[in-house]
Amino acid sequence: MGLKAAQKTLFPLRSIDDVVRLFAAELGREEPDLVLLSLVLGFVEHFLAVNRVIPTNVPELTFQPSPAPDPPGGLTYFPVADLSIIAALYARFTAQIRGAVDLSLYPREGGVSSRELVKKVSDVIWNSLSRSYFKDRAHIQSLFSFITGTKLDSSGVAFAVVGACQALGLRDVHLALSEDHAWVVFGPNGEQTAEVTWHGKGNEDRRGQTVNAGVAERSWLYLKGSYMRCDRKMEVAFMVCAINPSIDLHTDSLELLQLQQKLLWLLYDLGHLERYPMALGNLADLEELEPTPGRPDPLTLYHKGIASAKTYYRDEHIYPYMYLAGYHCRNRNVREALQAWADTATVIQDYNYCREDEEIYKEFFEVANDVIPNLLKEAASLLEAGEERPGEQSQGTQSQGSALQDPECFAHLLRFYDGICKWEEGSPTPVLHVGWATFLVQSLGRFEGQVRQKVRIVSREAEAAEAEEPWGEEAREGRRRGPRRESKPEEPPPPKKPALDKGLGTGQGAVSGPPRKPPGTVAGTARGPEGGSTAQVPAPTASPPPEGPVLTFQSEKMKGMKELLVATKINSSAIKLQLTAQSQVQMKKQKVSTPSDYTLSFLKRQRKGL
C-alpha cells in the first residue's frame, strides 16, 4: 500500500507554502500519514541545512529559485520534493517494516497491540540502525535520515516506532513525551507504556519495559506521570518542533525557520498545540525572531504554554517557565526573569534529582552560575553608571539597574535557590557543591544590605499562628504564591497583576490582609463600662507591616541560612558551608504513589516535545 491519489496530487512541493498545504491536507484527515510527513520534512531539512550544495549528478533533484528578502534582489533556492523521490522513500520504509513484522504471530485481542508486538517493531527499527555513529549529531531525527543514512537520534527512534506501527495499522500505539525523553503508550486507552529507545549518553537497553519505575522515583525525566500522551495530530506537532534549522554553530537556515513557524501556526490555529507547552514556547521564540503580523506576541504565547502545563500537566513541566525566563533575560527584564526562574525552581523542588536528570541539572547550573551572575553584574554596572551620570540613561537601562534596589528581585533570587535546595532533599544524588555556593555569594552581594533586610522571611510556625486570625488564610495564600509586596496602611492596595503568574507556590502580587485587632474589639468602637452606649474611640493601632515581600522557605538549608541571607554584611564562609553541607535533619520518606495512580489520574484529563 503506497501513497493515496489525493496525496499524490499535491506533488511536487516547490515551496514552503506547498509543504504547508500538504500538512494542512493531512491534518484534515483522522489519521495524518506520519511517514509521509516525516520524509518530506527530512528531505527539505537535508538540502537546506545538511547539504546546501546543489547536486548536479541527481537528475530527479531540482531546486526552485525564488526572490530572497536579504539581500534585496538575491535568490533563495528551495529543494523540490518530487513525487518519484518521496514515493520511493515511502515504499522502501513500509516494505521494510511489513516484511519484518508478521502480524499473524501477535494476536491483537480487542484490537489493541501487545507488548511483544511493540517490542518487535522497536527491534526492527533498532536493528536497522548503523552500529556506530554519534547519536547526538544534528539532523538525524526524521525518517528520511533513517532510510537514507540508517541513523536516528533517541527521540527519532521513538517516533520511527510510532510511524512503523501506523504503517502496520496499529492505531492504538502513540508517542509519549516528557521534556527530555520519548517512549510509546498503547493498549486500551493508552494505559500501557513501553520504552523503545535509549536515553542520555549510554545505550542502556530497556526496550519493552514500562516507565513505572521512573515515575515512582519522582525523577524529572518521567515528570511524575505528567507526561504528554500524544494523539496523531500532536505527533505531527512533535516532528515540526523537531525541525533543526542550524546549518552550523553560528548559522540557521532562514527557509527552515520560516517553514517551522508557518507549520506551528497551522497547528496552533487547528488547536493541536493546546496540550503541547513546549511547542508554544518554540513558536514564541520564533515570533520573537520574526514577528508575524496580526498574531499574538511572544509573551502571550509563553504564558499560554505555562497555562497549558498548569491545565493539563499539574504544573509539573519545567521548560515553559525556562522559555519565559529566557525571553525576559534576553530583553534585560531582570525582575521578570528572576521571577520566572524562581517559578521554575518551585516546580523542580517537588522532584527527586536522579542520575538521568542530567539535562535539567545543566540548565539550572548554567542559570545559577552563569546567566544570573552576569545579568546582575550588568545591572550593577548600569546602576553605578546611572549614579555617576544621572539623566543620561534610557528608561529601560535605568529599570535594569534599579532591579538591584528592589527587594522583590532579591526575594525571587532566594526563592530560586530555595527550590534548588528542596530539590536536593531526599534525592539519591546530591545537587549542590562549592561552585554553586561561590556564585550564590556573588549574586547575594549585588544587593545592598538595606535591600536584603526588607525581605521578611517567616517560618512555618509563624504561619500556623496566623491561621488563628480571620485574615490568616489570605496571607498564607499570598505566601504560597511567593514574594509579595505588603500594602502600607496609608496606601490603597496595589492593583492585582494579570493572571499570568505561576500558581501555588510561585506567583506574586498578593496583598496582605487588614491590620490585626486585639481579641474582642471592633475597629472604631468601644463598649462603656456598663455595657450601655458605645463611645467612638480610636482603635488600638497595630505596628505597620514590613515594606518588603514576605517569603517562606521550604528547604532546610535555606531555613538554616535565614539570618545570614538578610544580614547587613554577607558572611560568605558561613553561607558556603551551609549550602554545601549535607542536610542535618532526617528527611521524611515521601510516600510514593503506585504507578497506576499517575496513569489513571492523567487519563481522566487526557493529553511535548523535545
UniProtKB/Swiss-Prot annotation:
Its main location: nucleus. Changing residue 26 to K: In parathyroid adenoma and MEN1. Changing residue 286 to P: In MEN1; almost no effect on JUND-binding. Signal peptide: none annotated. Changing residue 139 to D: In MEN1; almost complete loss of histone methylation; strong decrease in JUND-binding; no repression of JUND transactivation; reduced interaction with KMT2A. Residues 214-390 are annotated as: Interaction with FANCD2. Changing residue 447 to S: In MEN1; sporadic; with Zollinger-Ellison syndrome. It is found in: Nucleus. GO terms for biological process: DNA damage response; DNA repair; MAPK cascade; negative regulation of cell cycle; negative regulation of cell population proliferation; negative regulation of cyclin-dependent protein serine/threonine kinase activity; negative regulation of DNA-binding transcription factor activity; negative regulation of DNA-templated transcription. Changing residue 156 to D: In MEN1 and parathyroid tumor. It comes from the Eukaryota. Residues 484-500 have a biased composition (Basic and acidic residues). The modification Phosphoserine is found at residues 487, 543. Changing residue 285 to R: Reduced interaction with KMT2A. One of its GO terms (molecular function) is Y-form DNA binding. Changing residue 267 to P: Found in isolated hyperparathyroidism; likely pathogenic. Changing residue 255 to K: Found in isolated hyperparathyroidism; likely pathogenic. The keyword Signal does not apply. Changing residue 22 to R: In MEN1; no effect on histone methylation; almost no effect on JUND-binding; no repression of JUND transactivation. InterPro entries: Menin (IPR007747). Residues 460-552 are annotated as: Disordered. Pfam families: Menin. It is linked to Familial multiple endocrine neoplasia type I: Autosomal dominant disorder characterized by tumors of the parathyroid glands, gastro-intestinal endocrine tissue, the anterior pituitary and other tissues. Cutaneous lesions and nervous-tissue tumors can exist. Prognosis in MEN1 patients is related to hormonal hypersecretion by tumors, such as hypergastrinemia causing severe peptic ulcer disease (Zollinger-Ellison syndrome, ZES), primary hyperparathyroidism, and acute forms of hyperinsulinemia. MEN1 inactivating mutations are responsible for hyperfunctioning of the parathyroid glands and subsequent primary hyperparathyroidism. Primary hyperparathyroidism can occur in isolation or in association with multiple endocrine neoplasia. Essential component of a MLL/SET1 histone methyltransferase (HMT) complex, a complex that specifically methylates 'Lys-4' of histone H3 (H3K4). Functions as a transcriptional regulator. Binds to the TERT promoter and represses telomerase expression. Plays a role in TGFB1-mediated inhibition of cell-proliferation, possibly regulating SMAD3 transcriptional activity. Represses JUND-mediated transcriptional activation on AP1 sites, as well as that mediated by NFKB subunit RELA. Positively regulates HOXC8 and HOXC6 gene expression. This is Menin.
